[in-house]
Amino acid sequence: MLDPTYPLFPTFAFLGFVLALVPLPWHLQAWNSGTCFFMVWTALGCLNQFVNSIVWKDNAINSAPIWCEISIRITMGLSVGLPASSLCIIRRLYHIAKVRAVSHTRAEKMRVIIIDALICVLFPLVYIAMQYIVQGHRFNILENVGCYPAVFNTPVTYVVSYIWPVLIGMVSATYSVLALIEFNRHRLQFSQFLHSNSTLSVSRYLRLMALAMTEMCCTVPLGIFVIVLNCTSTPIEPWVSLKATHYWYSRVDQYPAVVWRSSHLVVVCNELTRWLAPVSAMLFFAYFGFAQEARRNYAAAWAWACRALGLPERIATLPTTKSKGPGFAEKFAAKAKGLSSFNVKDFTSEFSSKAHDFTSKAKQYTLPRPMPQTPSSSGFSSSESTRFGSSVDGKELPSPTTKEFSSPIPIHLSGMQTLVSFDSNKDLPSPPAYDVEAQYGPYNIDNRVSYHIADAGVRASYPMGVAYSSDSEHRRINPHATFTSANNDTDEPTSPALPDTPSSCSSSATFSTLQSRDFIVLPSTTDVTRDTGSLPIRRSPAGPPRLPSLSQLFGISSMRAEGRDVEAQVQDVATGTAAPTTTAPAPASTTIAPATTTATAPTTTANIQRGEPDVPTSPRTHRASV
C-alpha cells in the first residue's frame, strides 16, 4: 500500500536531524546541558524515523533485526527523554526567575550538568530497561513505519510505561507556573541579573521558556491520548507472571499497511508518535536557529569553511544594514513638498561637497573622528523656553544611555552626514563620541534669546530628543521651535555664556531641514566667535535609557515667556536665581537668512501632527555638518 506521507516524512525527518544539531556547538560552550540533551534526543529520534521510513517503505519484512532492537529502544527512550529535557530547561529557568545565582565556577557547572544528566540520560536508560517487564515479544514491524515496540496491555504496563511521560509533563507544568510567578514578582532584579550573566539574555530566556512549554503542550496530550487509546481499543489482559508475559518472546509480528491503517485511531496514534521528533526539531530551530548568536556562528563557520577551501570570504561579518531602498534624501524631499517656504536644493547646496555614501561600509568606521569646522557667518538658532529642574512637562528626564547601545554609524546622504545607531548591537565599537554643542547667540528679530549652533556632533545613542551633561542646571530648547539662519556679524551684544546643561530639541516641519528627527542640542560655555574650532570630547555618562513621552517630542508648540524681560531671565539663569514663569505659544520667528535661505513656515501642533509620521522608538541621533 502506498504511503501518503512519502517522501514528505523522510525529508522532514532528515532535515530535523541536521537542524537539531546545528546550534549544538555554541550551546555546549554556554554549558546549557538541558538544551543540549533536548537536541541530542531530538536528533536521535529524527535519525531513527528517517531510517525506518526508508528501509520499510512499502514492505514489512524483517530485514534488519539488529537495527530494530536498537530502534525500538530509541523510541522508548525518546518518549521520556524529550519531556525530561524540557523539565531540566524549565527547572533552570525557574531558579533564574528566583534571582538565584547562576553557577559560575567549574565545580558548580559540573554539579548542574550531573543533575541534568541524571534526569535526561540515566532516567531514560532505567525506563528502557523497565520496558522488558511488559514487552510481550521482540518487536513489531509496520509497513511504511518500521520497527515498533511490542508492549503487552496489562495494568502493570500503565504504571511502568504509559504514565511517565504524563507525570514528567505535569512536573514541568508546575515549574512553568512557578517560573512565571517568580518572573512577575522579581522583574527588576531579574533584568539586572540577566544583564550580569554573559551566557543568558532576556531573549534567550523567553525562547527557552517558549520551547519547553511548547514541547510540554505536545507530549502531555499525546501521552494522555495513548493511555485512552490503549484502554479502549484493545482489551486489558490480567497480569499473571513475567513468564506468561514473555511466552514466545522471540517472535516478530509484521503488519501490512492495509491492516494497521484500517483503524483510524491507530493511524492517528502511530503518525503522531513518529512525527513528534521532526516537529520538535523544527520548533527548536525556529526558536534558536535565527537568533543573533546563531547568525554570528553561521558567519564564523562560513569564514572557516572559506579559509579551509581557499575561497574568498564573501561573508565575514554579520550584515548591519538592510537592502538599499529609496534614499533618505528622496523620502525627505517628498515630505517637504508641502512646505512652500523650504527649498531642498538651496538647503543642501550649503553643505560640504565632500560627502560620500558610506552605507555599504558602515562597519569600517571607527570613532572618534575629527569634528567638522563650521563657518562663522551663519548657523541655526532656536527660541529658548523657561528654566526647569529635573523634569520636562511633569515627566522625569530619562537617564543617559548605557553600553547596551552601540556607537553611531556614519552615512552621508545628499550633503548631510547622518549618524544612525543600532539598538543593542554589541558587535559595534563603543569609544567616546562627540557631544552636540551650541553657543549662546545674539537676539533675533523677535527679540528672543537664541542659541547659535557652532558645531554638531553625537554624544551617544540616546532615546529620542534628550541630551545630558554632568551639570545640575537643566535648560532646554523648545521642541518644534522655529530654526532660522543667524548672522554672527550683528552688532548686538551677546548674552553671558550658559553652563553646559542638558537640552532637547525634536524636529518640526522647519527644523527638519537639518534632516534630524531627534536632534540633540547642548548650550555651550564658549562665546560666539568667528572661529569656533573643534569641540572637546567627553565620555557619555552611564545609566539605563528610557524614552521620553511623545508629548515632549511632537505635541509642544513654540513657547515664549510672558511678564518678564528676556534679558532679565538670562541674568537670573546665570546667577542661579531664576524663578518659574508661565509660558505661552510663541509666534513663528522671522527668518534672518542669507540670500540662499528662504523664509521658514510657522510651526504649529496641527501642522506637525499632519505633516510628520511617528518616529521609530529605536534610539537614534543625527549629526549635521553645518
From Swiss-Prot:
Origin: domain of life: Eukaryota
Described purpose of this protein according to its UniProt entry: Receptor for the BAP3 pheromone, a prenylated mating factor.
Similarity comment: Belongs to the G-protein coupled receptor 4 family.
UniProt feature, compositional bias: Low complexity: 376-391, 574-606
Predominant subcellular localization, coarse grouping: membrane
Name the UniProt record assigns to this protein: Pheromone B alpha 3 receptor
GO MF annotation list: mating-type alpha-factor pheromone receptor activity
InterPro entries with a match to the protein in the record: GPCR_Pheromne_B_alpha_rcpt, GPCR_STE3
Species this chain originates from: Schizophyllum commune (strain H4-8 / FGSC 9210)
Membrane topology: Multi-pass membrane protein
GO biological process, one term: pheromone-dependent signal transduction involved in conjugation with cellular fusion
Originating gene: BAR3
